[in-house]
Amino acid sequence: MTIQTDDFAPAPPRVVSAAPASPQEEAIERALRPKLLDEYVGQAKVREQLEIFIGAARKRKEALDHVLLFGPPGLGKTTLSHIIAAELGVNLRQTSGPVLEKPKDLAALLTNLEPNDVLFIDEIHRLSPVVEEILYPALEDYQIDIMIGEGPAARSIKLDLQPFTLVGATTRAGMLTNPLRDRFGIVARLEFYTPEELALIVRRSAGLLKVDTDAAGGFEIARRSRGTPRIANRLLRRVRDYAEVKGNGRITEDIAHKALVMLDVDPQGFDLMDRKLLEAVIHRFDGGPVGLDNVAASIGEERDTIEDVIEPYLIQQGYLQRTPRGRIATLAAYRHLGVTPPSSRSDGQDLFGI
């Protein structure tokens, strides 16, 4: 049997992916980030909590309690870490869980922090157990134990640290160990944004990019952005390109609609991968329930990518259900794809009684 290698080729980058597409895009994101809480749009409850906690810490001239931010990618966890440091008037040191391979990597960061500084660890759920063990006394007592020497002559010494705030970010809060999770005094979940909130973000970003955009054009981009600011800003830049080449440079509702159709982003913000996932569940697995590994194999995508990037929005919007027995396509998914659901589902009841 001949195997076509194209069947196993990685999927092309998605314009509606919440992950940064390139270092260049990360640089653009940094330029568009709000710098202070007053500039931050959305996440009203989280913003209010941080205003109070930061204000209290600043008033007492103490380090802010350690903060855990979790939620789907692209919702502003990194942005909030920068804002927290800016509001406190302290330095920010940034790293990620996979980078901290050895205890000495973390020790080097911790011992160089100044009083009340913020240490931001992205993907904190990916810290190795040995590094995580070093972090516990640092978070509780502002102390770390490090080993000096090797072999029989090795000994442990205790180093005092300056008070600091750890801001941890993760898309997989369930993968955090209980001891680590319990050491965060402030825990905040970031939710998907409403189209109205994203329209404000698009308008702000358009102003910074000097893009002429009317309200209807901005809202057309916002409503297809999957509740995610990173996607909204990316779509804004792609629609800007279309407007400059196919129009007069101004983003109107019509221009935005045509550009997004060209990009294969439908009115719900779904792209080819979203539709492939829903079609696979409906057509290949009779609507489900189907296990995640089977779904991943059927559409040629990584399990983690489906779970972290594709699924959350489909579930949040009510097109997919995650059950103990597997994934199930909802009636909304059938309607969106123009497929007649089985009679047992047409009345709103699940085919499998789940």
Curated annotation (Swiss-Prot):
One matching Pfam family: RuvB_C
Region (Large ATPase domain (RuvB-L)): 5-193
Example GO molecular function: ATP hydrolysis activity
UniProt-listed GO biological process terms: DNA recombination; DNA repair
Disulphide bridges, residue numbers: none
EC number, as in UniProt: 3.6.4.-
Region (Small ATPAse domain (RuvB-S)): 194-264
Catalytic activity line of the entry: ATP + H2O = ADP + phosphate + H(+)
UniProt xrefs under InterPro entries: AAA+_ATPase, AAA_lid_4, DNA_helicase_Holl-junc_RuvB, P-loop_NTPase, RuvB-like_N, RuvB_C, WH-like_DNA-bd_sf, WH_DNA-bd_sf
This protein's UniProt keywords: ATP-binding, Cytoplasm, DNA damage, DNA recombination, DNA repair, DNA-binding, Hydrolase, Nucleotide-binding
EC category name: hydrolase
Region (Head domain (RuvB-H)): 267-354
Residue ranges, annotated region (Disordered): 1-22
CDD domains: AAA
GO cellular component: cytoplasm; Holliday junction resolvase complex
Predominant localisation class: cytoplasm
Binding site for ATP: 32-33, 74, 77-79, 140-142, 183, 193, 230
Chain positions recorded as Mg(2+) binding sites: 78
Quaternary organization: Homohexamer. Forms an RuvA(8)-RuvB(12)-Holliday junction (HJ) complex. HJ DNA is sandwiched between 2 RuvA tetramers; dsDNA enters through RuvA and exits via RuvB. An RuvB hexamer assembles on each DNA strand where it exits the tetramer. Each RuvB hexamer is contacted by two RuvA subunits (via domain III) on 2 adjacent RuvB subunits; this complex drives branch migration. In the full resolvosome a probable DNA-RuvA(4)-RuvB(12)-RuvC(2) complex forms which resolves the HJ.
Function field: The RuvA-RuvB-RuvC complex processes Holliday junction (HJ) DNA during genetic recombination and DNA repair, while the RuvA-RuvB complex plays an important role in the rescue of blocked DNA replication forks via replication fork reversal (RFR). RuvA specifically binds to HJ cruciform DNA, conferring on it an open structure. The RuvB hexamer acts as an ATP-dependent pump, pulling dsDNA into and through the RuvAB complex. RuvB forms 2 homohexamers on either side of HJ DNA bound by 1 or 2 RuvA tetramers; 4 subunits per hexamer contact DNA at a time.
NCBIfam families per record: PRK00080.1, ruvB
Family: Belongs to the RuvB family.
Domain notes: Has 3 domains, the large (RuvB-L) and small ATPase (RuvB-S) domains and the C-terminal head (RuvB-H) domain. The head domain binds DNA, while the ATPase domains jointly bind ATP, ADP or are empty depending on the state of the subunit in the translocation cycle. During a single DNA translocation step the structure of each domain remains the same, but their relative positions change.
Name recorded for this polypeptide: Holliday junction branch migration complex subunit RuvB
Lineage of origin: Bacteria, Pseudomonadati, Pseudomonadota, Betaproteobacteria, Burkholderiales
